[in-house]
């Protein structure tokens, strides 16, 4: 409908307004038929056209109507032309009730047509402001006056009904009116248009920004793909170079091992009855040293024999006359031409001095050979260890540099235990060297035993994963390979463990040993400060790693497989916790309470680790274990060696300070009630050099303690 109104020409709009206002148009002849048709086309909302005064048929009136007074051919307009009131008059003449269905329907359609038409005309935004504003203000009143001025063609009975119709039309028309003026509407339109332009501009900007961002995302995505491809190439090249380097190192190790087999020795298989055993055969280096020792021994024996003969030819002392028998013997020897005649005193001393010098030289040479022999023994230990490592590596299923978990490239075998292998590996993700411990279960085990071992390893992983201390080896990762094997990824340390160092060097200085003990105690203090606290239970030189392979560097503690968690359910601050794994561990480093057999399991606490610290410190200082040094674990268990270790004995050499001996005694107290715990161990004066010096120099109590400890040390050493 709005499109039809907009399509009218100005002349027809003026004619339409004249019909609403009742004012004639003097600008030319008016075609009433066309104007009525246009009005009906605009005002009709239903499919049935509204009846006009020309078309309506009055069934009630049978009289003839006058001819149309308005003649379009004459070109003049008369006041008897059809007005808008005629449409309302038709509506007023039809009663609201008592009509048939078609009449009621036509009345309802005519009633709804006019307000709709008026609302459409008022809402038309493009009408001229000067023409529409004054006319639109009086539309309502024009309808009422037009109805009053029109001649009534009905009786007085229809007057009230027509008035009610006029009121209804007037009310409906007022309800469709608005308080907004054309100026306000135009202002709102302008503001809306400006807002719309701003929004459209903002939308355009956002679209351009979105396009730019999409373009940048595409560029970054392409760059990311490019970098990923480059990274993959770098990783592939790194793997290739690492494998080549590992192969070269393996070849070099095997060449060196083959050379050392001739120089240091090798294992040979010897048959004993129905069984075969491996027997060690020394190489030519040891054989040469043994020959030199045999030569030195034979020369020493010869010198001793000559010294005895020289003693027989020793001249008598001054003032003593030789006996007659000696003279007769000398004569006989001279007559016989023998050379063992009596020497003069000067000749005797000269010959004696020569023999002494020769013996001294042989002794020095023997010491050098002994030192060389000890050095070769240390090298032989390395050689034997390398032979075993190469043998285990050649028989391993992981010898061909596999990549485990798509991340860890195995390089070479570090060592092998009962059910595990430790490989040096490279982490391709973090770009660092790691130690991968591969746990392999025996396929012949029962499922229950496999589950128990796996549960034990998971427990170790959970304990170790939460630890974060510079003196404890870090655990990075844990994953399964198959149903019978899984891996743990640990921090890699270049050096060896303390046990290997002691086998190579026997012992170390007190300063170096104290430095190692201080670091161990620092780690134990951390284990007892976390919640819940942890007992390591398996402290020994084999579980203490030397980072750079020397005794004057950093250490790290590893292997938490036997650790005990002191949670609230199992640990009592007075009695400790029950030892559920009695018989496990390394017996040389366990305290006596771990070997007590009774109806109930023994109670342990962190004092177990304190005892282990004392044993390790003693072994570092003296090169031997304080209890059961040359015994096996089975002998220690059968002979109750640790249960009998009520007091520690110190050898006279090497020389150790009284403070170190007192510290060892505090750690190796037989009764656990008399032994210090980890917290007291961390505050021990011996491990704090500045406090120890100040106490020994300024405090009389410290001097008294030092004197008593020195006296006790003297008494024990005596």
UniProtKB/Swiss-Prot annotation:
Tissue: Ubiquitously expressed in all tissues examined, with high levels in heart and testis, in particular the pachytene spermatocytes and in round spermatids. Some evidence for the existence of a testis-specific isoform suggesting a role in spermatogenesis.
EC number(s) stated in the UniProt entry for this protein: 2.7.11.1
GO molecular function, one term: ATP binding
Predominant cellular place of this UniProt entry's protein: nucleus
GO biological process: cell differentiation; chromatin organization; chromosome segregation; DNA damage response; intracellular signal transduction; negative regulation of proteasomal ubiquitin-dependent protein catabolic process; peptidyl-serine phosphorylation; protein phosphorylation
Protein name: Serine/threonine-protein kinase tousled-like 2
Location of this chain's protein in the cell: Nucleus; Nucleus, Nucleoplasm; Cytoplasm, Perinuclear region; Cytoplasm, Cytoskeleton
Entry binding sites for ATP: 414-422, 437
Organism: Mus musculus
Biased composition (Polar residues): 29-44
């Amino acid at each position: 409908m709005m499109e039809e109104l907009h399509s009218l020409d100005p002349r027809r709009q003026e004619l339409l307004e004249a019909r609403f206002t009742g004012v004639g148009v003097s600008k030319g002849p008016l075609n009433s038929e066309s104007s009525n048709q246009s009005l009906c086309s605009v005002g009709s909302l239903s499919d049935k056209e509204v009846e006009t005064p020309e078309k309506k048929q009055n069934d009630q009136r049978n009289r003839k109507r006058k001819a149309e007074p308005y003649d379009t051919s004459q070109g003049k307009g008369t006041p008897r032309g059809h007005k808008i009131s005629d449409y309302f008059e038709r509506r007023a003449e039809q009663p609201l009730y008592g009509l048939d269905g078609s009449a009621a329907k036509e009345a309802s359609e005519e009633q709804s047509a006019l307000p709709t038409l008026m609302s459409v005309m008022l809402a038309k935004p493009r009408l001229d402001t000067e023409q529409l504003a004054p006319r639109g203000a009086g539309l309502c009143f024009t309808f009422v006056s037009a109805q009053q001025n029109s001649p009534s063609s009905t009786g007085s009975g229809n007057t009230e009904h027509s008035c009610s119709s006029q009121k209804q039309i007037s009310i409906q028309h007022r309800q469709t009116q608005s308080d907004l003026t054309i100026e306000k509407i135009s202002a709102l339109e302008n503001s809306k248009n400006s807002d719309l332009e701003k929004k459209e501009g903002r939308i355009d900007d956002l679209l351009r920004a979105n396009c730019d961002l999409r373009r940048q995302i595409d560029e970054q995505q392409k760059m990311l793909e490019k970098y990923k491809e480059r990274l993959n190439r770098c990783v592939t090249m790194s793997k290739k170079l690492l494998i080549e380097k590992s192969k070269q190192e393996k070849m070099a190790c095997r060449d060196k091992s083959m050379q050392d087999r001739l120089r240091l020795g090798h294992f040979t298989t010897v048959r004993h009855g129905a069984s075969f055993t491996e027997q060690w055969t020394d190489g030519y280096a040891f054989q040469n040293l043994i020959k030199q020792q045999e030569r030195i021994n034979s020369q020493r024996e010869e010198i001793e024999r000559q010294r005895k003969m020289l003693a027989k030819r020793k001249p008598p002392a001054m003032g003593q006359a030789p006996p007659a028998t000696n003279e007769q013997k000398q004569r006989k020897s001279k007559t016989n031409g023998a050379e063992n005649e009596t020497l003069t005193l000067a000749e005797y001393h000269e010959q004696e001095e020569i023999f002494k010098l020769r013996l001294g030289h042989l002794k020095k040479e023997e010491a050098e050979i002994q030192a060389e022999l000890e050095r070769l023994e240390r090298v032989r230990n390395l050689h034997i260890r390398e032979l075993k490592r190469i043998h285990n590596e050649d028989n391993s299923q992981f010898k061909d540099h596999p990549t485990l978990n798509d991340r860890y490239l195995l390089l070479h075998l570090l060592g092998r235990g009962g059910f595990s292998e430790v490989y040096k590996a490279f982490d391709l993700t973090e770009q660092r060297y790691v130690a991968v411990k591969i746990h392999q279960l025996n396929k012949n085990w029962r499922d229950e035993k496999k589950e128990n071992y796996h549960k034990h390893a998971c427990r170790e992983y959970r304990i170790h994963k939460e630890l974060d201390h510079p003196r404890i080896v870090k655990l990075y990762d844990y994953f399964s390979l198959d149903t019978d094997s899984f891996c743990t990824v640990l921090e890699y340390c270049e050096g060896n463990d303390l046990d290997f160092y002691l086998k190579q060097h026997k012992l170390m200085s007190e300063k170096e040993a104290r430095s190692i003990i201080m670091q161990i105690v620092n780690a134990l203090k951390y284990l007892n400060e976390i919640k819940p606290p942890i007992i390591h239970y398996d402290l020994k030189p084999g579980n203490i790693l030397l980072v750079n392979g020397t005794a004057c560097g950093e250490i790290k503690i590893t292997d938490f497989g036997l650790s005990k968690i002191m949670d609230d359910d199992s640990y009592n601050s007075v009695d400790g916790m029950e030892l559920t794994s009695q018989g496990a561990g390394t017996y040389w480093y366990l305290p006596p309470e771990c070997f007590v057999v009774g109806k109930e399991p023994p109670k342990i606490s962190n004092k177990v680790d304190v005892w282990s610290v004392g044993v390790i410190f003693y072994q570092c200082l003296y090169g031997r274990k304080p209890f059961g040094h040359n015994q096996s674990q089975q002998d220690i268990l059968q002979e109750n060696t640790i249960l009998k270790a009520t007091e520690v004995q110190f050898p006279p050499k090497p020389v150790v300070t009284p403070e170190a001996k007192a510290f060892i005694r505090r750690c190796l107290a037989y009764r656990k009630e008399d032994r210090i715990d980890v917290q007291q161990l961390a505050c021990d004066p011996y491990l704090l050099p500045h406090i120890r010096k100040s106490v020994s120099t300024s405090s009389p109590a410290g001097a008294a303690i030092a004197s008593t400890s020195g006296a006790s040390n003297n008494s024990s050493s005596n």
